[in-house]
Regions:
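Right-handed parallel beta-helix/beta-spiral solenoid domain characteristic of secreted/periplasmic
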Residues: 1-12, 212-214
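Right-handed parallel beta-helix
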Residues: 1-6, 22-38, 44, 55-69, ...
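Feature targets compositionally biased, intrinsically disordered low-complexity regions
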Residues: 4, 34, 38, 44, ...
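Extracellular beta-strand/beta-solenoid scaffold signature
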Residues: 7-20, 38-52, 69-80, 97-112, ...
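Intrinsically disordered, low-complexity segments enriched in small/polar residues
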Residues: 15, 45-46, 92, 103, ...
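N-terminal targeting or signal-anchor segments and their processing/structural boundaries
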Residues: 21-24, 53-56, 81, 109-114, ...
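Glycine-rich loops and low-complexity Gly/Arg-rich segments
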Residues: 23, 41, 52-55, 88, ...
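Acidic, glycine- and Ser/Thr-rich low-complexity intrinsically disordered tracts
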Residues: 169-240
Length: 240
């Protein structure tokens, strides 16, 4: 399914939860979603939860998501609800969240008896996101941060051309990092450990570093085939 947001009457998110109730899982698979950078509808974000809703899961898989500038909201944005599980898996995400955060999950935990949500971000190619200003966050996640926190995994992702950090929040749990690859990530704190004594809560991927250019085939056309054999053999990014 292809969802063209460029001619929407409003710039609301593609998915906007407006009723405080319990929802079954939202399962997005093998789709394309896009908005306009200019000359059309500039979307606020991908999803938005600003009510006390309980959502079993949000699964975003095997999809192309691009040109969602996030004018007025963050990319994956939950403010008052509780998503039990967020899975972002095997997607190509590019030209998004120009000056906004990637995953935002505010602390509404006390309304839901302080559960521990799971966030799994695996095998994605993320290019030119959070790249309009320095220091935006991949994980602006604070849900239940004053209690047991969150369970976050970042695995096998290819992250390129960004000025983002992972976080700068004391209430964001340190993710489990494994086999992520980076190129032209210009803010060194994306790799920095936390220093709670100095209130520097980077929670970065200390095993990561900027590597070689993956040499995408034709990124302007949405083709992120990896041309660098040394990067390709690491099995990072989306397999599309």
């Amino acid at each position: 399914m292809i969802v063209d947001g460029t001619k929407n009457a409003t710039n609301d998110q593609f998915f906007n939860y407006k009723t405080a109730t319990t929802y079954k899982a939202l399962d997005i698979n093998n789709c394309e979603f896009y908005g306009a950078v200019s000359g059309g509808t500039v979307m606020k974000g991908f999803y938005y939860v600003n009510v006390a809703a309980t959502i079993e899961a949000v699964n975003i898989r095997n999809s192309y998501i691009h040109d969602i500038t996030c004018d007025g909201g963050d990319m994956f944005d939950c403010r008052k609800g509780y998503m039990k599980t967020l899975n972002i898996n095997n997607n190509i995400i590019y030209n998004c969240a120009k000056e906004r955060d990637f995953v935002r999950y505010d602390d509404a935990a006390k309304s839901f008896n302080n559960p521990v949500p799971e966030i799994n971000i695996t095998n994605n190619t993320i290019d030119n996101c959070m790249n309009g200003v320095n220091g935006k966050r991949i994980l602006y996640v604070r849900f239940n941060g004053k209690k047991a926190g969150q369970h976050i995994k970042m695995t096998n992702n290819l992250i390129t051309n960004t000025q983002a950090v992972y976080t700068n929040q004391a209430t964001t749990s340190t993710p489990e990092y494994s086999n992520n690859y980076y190129f032209n990530c210009t803010n060194a704190n994306i790799f920095a450990p936390s220093d709670s004594g100095n209130s520097l809560y980077w929670n970065g991927d200390t095993s990561g570093r900027n590597g070689s250019d993956p040499k995408y085939k034709a990124p302007s056309k949405g083709d992120f085939t990896i041309g660098n054999e040394e990067v390709s053999k690491l099995k990072v990014g989306a397999t599309r």
